[in-house]
Amino acid sequence: MNCLIVDDDELGRELIAEYLNGQASFDMAVNGREAVEKYKASCASGTPYDLIILDILMPEMNGHEAAKTIRRMEQEQGVTPDKGVNIIVLSALNTPKDIIETYVSAQSSAHLVKPVTREKLLLTLNKLGMISEEC
């Protein structure tokens, strides 16, 4: 699995990378703008990401805008929503209303509330069919 981890917090990026150790190869980005550029480059190189783990609150371009941009790029390439890259959004917002708004607005495959645990991440990846390992 080829993954892009996007978070402006270095510790957050490193923690997710540690959780994915042995499950995926990964790149990192510090904001939405960099994520979009890395996504474009991965597609151009013929090795597109299978998964993007994307924080919502970031400088320059937030996670909502990055996800919308990536989905728009997929649409322009004729990729149907069910065949697009899996995007897991991360957010500190934890009320049901916030979770639904974040999930829908970012057009994500899944949503995780921070702090993210290894078990929650692996369970989410399992539900998305990206891994078959038990947590």
Where are these regions (language model features)?
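A Lys-centered signature of the CheY-like receiver
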Residues: 113-114
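Receiver (REC) domain active-site loop signature in two-component systems and cognate sites
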Residues: 58, 70
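Alpha4 helix (beta4-alpha4-beta5 surface) of REC/receiver domains from two-component response regulators
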Residues: 65, 77, 82-85, 94-110, ...
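Hydrophobic/aromatic residues positioned on beta-strands within the core alpha/beta folds
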Residues: 90-91
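Active-site beta3 strand of CheY-like receiver
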Residues: 43-53
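Helix N-cap/capping motif at the beta->alpha junctions
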Residues: 28-41, 63
